Amino acid sequence: MNEPQLLIETWGQPGEIIDGVPMLESHDGKDLGLKPGLYIEGIFMQAEVVNRNKRLYPKRILEKAVKDYINEQVLTKQALGELNHPPRANVDPMQAAIIIEDMWWKGNDVYGRARVIEGDHGPGDKLAANIRAGWIPGVSSRGLGSLTDTNEGYRIVNEGFKLTVGVDAVWGPSAPDAWVTPKEITESQTAEADTSADDAYMALAEAMKKAL
């Protein structure tokens, strides 16, 4: 059996167009009642697909890893992520830029929502500024696991994989369809703001006017 190693996966390509349209997650009211703030939401991970790092996560293995991560980190409000993905297994809270609030499955895709951490002049403020300027971040996961080679040009993640960081916000992302939708929730809104960069900027401008 191979020794466990740090597996960093960059899931998706920011701004990727599939069949002529951006791969944006459709929102169905799940987000009603969110606290005011800036969020990123979309596909965090994918099972049963060869990603850009030439690795495949069997669904049964990723399901267990995600379930454990939700129970151990998301539900206990420990699920932090950073801006970019440093080469270590765990998050440095001093460098945290986001906190994951929810994760769920749709088919073979793991969706999630993370709140951008703002107000301390730290990495989250920089991430928020980039998003409000129109940047679309990608997402990257970190975990510990071993790999098995195949004869088809990719490697399979073995049983025992442990997800240690559900998502970091990164530039230039690895699952074919995984990138995220920024959205702004203001004091006067219970539904999400429009996900286009222009409309997100307008929502922010309106919120600033109301605060004056």
Curated annotation (Swiss-Prot):
Ranges where the record places region Homomultimerization: 117-136
EC number(s) on file: 3.4.21.-
Name under which the protein is recorded: Prohead core protein protease
Subunit-structure text: Homopentamer.
The protein's role, per its UniProt record: Serine protease ot the inner core, which is activated by autocatalytic cleavage after completion of prohead assembly and processes many prohead proteins. These cleaved peptides from the inner core and the auto-cleaved protease escape from the capsid, thus liberating space for the phage DNA genome. Cleaves the prohead proteins after the sequence motif L/I-X-E.
Comment text on domains: The N-terminus blocks the catalytic center.
Site (Cleavage): 9-10, 206-207
Recorded family membership: Belongs to the peptidase U9 family.
Residues making up the propeptide: 207-212
Alphabetized InterPro entries for the sequence: Peptidase_U9_T4_prohead
pH dependence (UniProt free text): Optimum pH is 8.5.
Residues annotated as catalytic: 85, 140
GO molecular function: serine-type peptidase activity
GO biological process, one term: viral procapsid maturation
